[in-house]
């Protein structure tokens, strides 16, 4: 099973922490892929940031789906 974790802000350091935590508890047959958008807010602190990040998250899911997709997506925020 492949699960894609999406950190909706652009912090690569936070994305790496999220991935490490998920891998610690994932089963042996679970592949964890963690991503964050290249463009968007560095932190989600307002309604504007949330709306901006939501578009970036949708684009990440669409791109992943077009490339073969994952079995599930987890948005690590909101």
Residues of each region from the PLM?
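N-terminal glycine-rich anion-binding loop in soluble enzyme alpha/beta folds
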Residues: 1-56
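Glycine/small-residue-rich loop that forms an oxyanion/phosphate-binding "nest" at active or ligand-binding sites
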Residues: 53-78
């Amino acid at each position: 099973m492949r699960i894609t974790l999406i950190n909706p802000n652009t912090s690569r350091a936070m994305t790496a922490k999220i991935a490490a935590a998920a891998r610690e508890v994932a089963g042996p047959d679970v592949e964890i892929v963690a991503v964050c958008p290249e463009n968007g807010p560095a932190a989600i602190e307002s309604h504007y940031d949330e709306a901006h990040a939501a578009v970036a998250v949708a684009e990440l899911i669409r791109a992943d789906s077009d490339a073969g997709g994952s079995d599930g997506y987890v948005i690590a925020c909101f």
